[in-house]
Amino acid sequence: KSELLNNQNLNININLNVKDIINIDELNNLFLKLEIESGDIKISDSYVTWKDDLVINLNESLINYDQGEIFLTGRINVDIKDTNDFYSSFQINKKFRKKIKEIQFDFNYNFSKEKISFDNLVIDQKKDNNIEEFINNFNLNTQVLNKVTFKNFVNEFFKIYFG
């Protein structure tokens, strides 16, 4: 919150490769491309692997400081390699386990409030009205994002999409 990095004269390019992320067993192979240019903090063209099932690509992302709060805004593209293991890990009901290859969405994460909102969600290059309504309702909710709320979100997401 000090805005130390928000300096018009500061330019940094960092590429960070992390094989294993400690205390988060499921995430590995993190590649983080951090660019600070004239005070803008960008984290684009980065990715992380969830087990060997998903590749989560972070695109067009920007960290900004606005009215005393820090936000990460961007686009995520999730490439799904193994749906079965993913569904098992999140204990998705078997009747809601169908093949999907890709999920794309925009997001805005408020670090100060630990809240996230989603927009423009596309599954296998198609929009779904039921999912749009689900996302809009989720965004109106004031719950803090944590492991439990995330798991519940994922379960409800697939229940609505394939239900």
Describe the role of every protein-language-model region.
Residues 1-163:
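Membrane-proximal interfacial segments on either side of biological membranes
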